[in-house]
Amino acid sequence: MAVPVEEAIAALSTFSLEDEQPEVQGPAVMVSAERAATDSPIEYSDVAAYRLSLSEDTKALNQLNTLIQEGKEMASILYTYRSCVKALPQLPESMKHSQADLYLETYQVLDLEMSRLREIQRWQSSASAKLAADMQRFSRPERRINGPTVTHLWSMLKLLDVLVQLDHLKNAKASIPNDFSWYKRTFTQVSAQWQDTDTMREELDDLQIFLSTRWAILLNLHVEMFRVNNVEDILQVLIVFIVESLELDFALLFPERYILLRVLPVLVVLATPSEKDTEALYKRVKLNRLINIFKNDPVIPAFPDLHLSPAAILKELSVYFQKFSSQTRLLTLPAPHELPPREALEYQRHYLIVNHIGALRAEHDDFTIRFASSMNQLLLLKSNDGAYTEWCREVKGNMYDMVVEGFQLLSRWTARIWEQCAWKFSRPCRDAGETPEASGSYSDYEKVVRFNYTAEERKALVELVGYIKSVGSMLQRCDTLVADALWETIHAEVQDFVQNTLATMLRTTFRKKKDLSRILSDMRTLSADWMANTRPEHEMPSSQHGNDESRGNFFYPRPVAPTAAQVHCLQFLIYEVVSGGNLRRPGGFFGNNGSEIPVNDLKQLETFFYKLSFFLHILDYSASIGILTDLGFLWFREFYLESSRVIQFPIECSLPWMLIDYILEAQNSGLLESVLLPFDIYNDSAQQALVVLRQRFLYDEIEAEVDHGFDIFVSRLSESIFTYYKSWSASELLDPSFLFALDNGEKFSIQPVRFTALFKMTKVKILGRTINLRSLIAQRMNRIFRENLEFLFDRFESQDLCAVVELEKLIDILKHSHELLSQDLSIDPFSLMLNEMQENISLVSFSSRLATQIWSEMQSDFLPNFILCNTTQRFVRSSKVPPTQKPSVPSAKPSFYCGTQDLNAAHQSFARLHSGFFGIPHLFSIVKLLGSRSLPWLIRALLDHISNKITTLEPMISGLQEALPKSIGLLSFDGGVTGCMKLIREQLNWGTKSELKSEVLRGIKEIGSVIYTMGLLDIVLREVDTKRFMQTAPWLGLIPGAEGQIVNAQDGESPLVNLLKSATSAVVSSPGCLNPAAFYTMSKQAEAADLLYKANMNGGSVLEYTLAFTSASLDKYCSKWSAPPKTGFVDITTSKDFYRIYGGLQIGYLEEITAPQSAQHEVLGDSIAWGGCTIIYLLGQQLHFELFDFSYQVLNVSEVETVSASHTHRNPQIHQGWEGLLEGMKKARRLNNHVFSMLKARCPLEDKTACAIKQSGAPLPRVRFENTVSAFETLPQKGTVG
């Protein structure tokens, strides 16, 4: 079934082709099928149809316009001319025989360039002659026209401006005469064998005179103009026109104003060839008016990096025009570099944008608000077909006024940038060497650009560039929307004037003046649109009463604009009516001196005359916007490039890049969204290089700089983004109590920066290319995050295990930064990055880089060099162990830590709290960092370390066993403590095995450190599991029972499964469900998750498994370390059991640590007790140890001695000399009891291994655990044995 066209169009109108990309770039060329405001042709081909005796004027006008276009091309050639001599190769001595060939090649290259200069010479001669002839045509008495039209005056001035610029460029380009001298030298060499070279030599001499003579073009023009001495009148007319236009702001756009300013000093010199002509000129234009104009604009923009000075031009031309040298008042005007300091300061206040940025900002804000309001009214009007006519006219007229105001604003703003640049070029930085960026040597271009703009001036320039580009883009986007409104408004203005205003004048003021009435009638004839007085029948009022005049006031709106020829003719006719064509008429164009026209009518004519001038700019809408927003001149530096003798300046000297660099450095959130606008300057300069200057090499240089600059820009922008989000994350993760306790906590807060607009930029237009900035930033972010993780791991690998808390904190900050950034940017998942950096991508890889490093640190540094404090539950580094050699800590930018220096210091203060010990906080960090994937691998590595240590200790303990006597009995109470200690020393004959004793103690200490670490890890894991259980229990329907056990809250399925099943059934039953299989899959996944979480509720104990594993590892040495008694009863004299060895080691160790200046305890710590007591307990020797340990027996003897002494009243100093040792024994006994009590609680032998000794003394067989040293098995559930 076919869809009706109306419905199809309505459906298509609901689609939007616009994306969400913000407008942070300047206007771009658009392709549109709608009517645009640029459809008006700018030409004068239809002037002849109006029969106004303007055919001769129009012919000359077209000729001048052709010359102007040709002259601009000549100026482009001169401006972009670069020295060929610089590129000439220097022949070595060995190739001197090829000198002739080099001369020929050089001549051929230079001849091409010289041919262009000869073409410029010929063209300027022809153009000067044609301009002079055109001026003389208006000075002939037989001419039929009273004076040139305004359009003609502008064409004369534009051509004269082109000639002045050509002369200025020829004077400024030092490479041209240099190349010419080489050209002449090579010509002399290669033309020796040529015939008939006289003509070529004459041309060469003429070209040499032309190039070497300053102001040769102007002198030639002067000669051409005064071949007939009657052009003074037209020169005075031009001067009067310029002065009035400048004083009355008749020059609507800034390029026109600069043309007038550049031409005026030259015209003043040309118009004063004699005293009589000078007096005549000053009668029409007072000298003070000229001086004021020259003083108001001491520098005039001419080229991107060249400026003109009226005072300098007048002084220089006075040398060539002797009659003008008497004009002392004009010649005493100071040039820019001659200004007194006070005047220079005043001019600086005027020229520098930073002094006016507040007013400019207010203008921009006010205009954008009012323009948006006018656009809304226009869109409302377009959506309302039945709007009444008066309101339509008002809305469209208001839109026209806003466009005119926008053009004027753009003109003023762009002119400010031109003038500031010209002022900067005229006033180079004198103290460039004192700036921070300045090196030992710097070029002139660096003086006028790089070191000549302060930070505030750069900021103001960035703002103004943003205003120009944003307003230009706003005007460009609405081109097709406002076209009809602009054309209708212009049409209404013209028709109202010619049909109503002129009709009134014809009936009143000019009724009896036949000549003027004829002119007014001609104006009506060539411009009136009589068809506009009719309306469609359905719009005609029901009754039409009244006279013809009232009906003539209404015009049906038509988007038909006047042509350029009509505007040209209307301006001419108005001028004829007002001035009568009298060139010498005082009072200017619209002065009322001697005029018979009433003031009111004269004012109406003047107003419409000025409106006509702007009509052409409005009709040429896009071209006008392009001119007014073109800032490409900020890049060009041809003059300074030539004078500096370098191939190209570094990017740091480029003004567009300086603006980008300032935005990135300043971190001003208000300017950051404008960071792409300076790239529009590159777009403008590239367009100018290709279209205006037509030089591909300039475009290539711009492209190279843009490619290099954009890479730097993306890199630095990405770093700024990363730093901001890193600082934001670090600020949020700071302890609130820490911030509350500070008086200056605000320095840790981060001011918001708006990167969102840049994140949405998927189509950045640079040099005709479209770049996805969002994608580039995402790629850089992925790279920076990986580099940051790599740095954090490298940093951790160069520190000890205590730095794991800091590592976890820094990774948390980085992860939170990733979360914040992921809200605005699509980047790789953080878990993926972390796994990549940990080299843990494979599904069967469990030993991650971090786990390997932690185990390496434990094995090489932590276990040997850290000692345990059982009271604080912390390991601290032994001060008596030499520090382990580690690689130096890598340094990095603050952004790789916490973002800013202040935040780095704050987080470092927290990190230092955990840098001096290893304990529960560190294990929390390890559990979080390793996760459930790598933590079991680390646990297994620690268990294997216990097994390996036991294996290593076995021969050492055997050596100690061999040194003991075969039988060791109980200590006698008769000898007291002293006797006991003497007997113990005799029995423990290990004097020759001191090194062996130390190795055994260190081995037992490492075993104890591992076991204690496992105990702490068990505490941490239980807390983590409890927290996870509290989060998942409500979803699984689990609640605590009456006796503390976990029970299901309800029979059947868990709340999670029920929720997803009900949601699935509800969604699938809906007719709009397109993919029910996905919801069924989610429901099945919920059931699987329910089973997995419930199965994982009763996790085993790491400590219990460690003890069971250690017990299994001891099984193979049980026969050696715990020999069963031969009699079947407890043997109290055995000396080979482990508890005997450990008892001997312990009392020797206690003697050492209690000795004066001993540091043995700082080497072993409390881990020795955990290792020894655990082995004793698991061997079933706890009772033996408590009964027969040497230190325990000494304490018993000491207690008996103390009691006996108290009963017999003997010397209380009975234990003198043994107090320290006895106190150490008591502490050791308390620590041993604590260890045994913990072991009984976590690994009761009656449950797992049964009791090794009955009260009767009969031994029982042990339950053996299978030892799997080299393979990892799942931790056993609580209560199970293997």
From Swiss-Prot:
Q: Which is a Pfam family this sequence falls into? A: FragX_IP
Going by the entry's taxonomy, the superkingdom of the source organism is recorded as Eukaryota
Name the GO cellular-component terms: SCAR complex
Tissue and organ distribution: Expressed in roots, root hairs, hypocotyls, cotyledons, stems, leaves, trichomes and flowers.
**GO molecular-function terms, A-Z:** small GTPase binding
Q: A GO term (biological process) for this protein? A: actin cytoskeleton organization
Task performed by this protein: Involved in regulation of actin and microtubule organization. Part of a WAVE complex that activates the ARP2/3 complex. Interacts with the active form of RHO-family GTPases.
**How does this protein assemble?**
Binds NAP1 and ROP2, but not ROP8.
| PANTHER family linked | CYTOPLASMIC FMR1-INTERACTING PROTEIN-RELATED (PTHR12195)
Name this protein carries in UniProt: Protein PIR
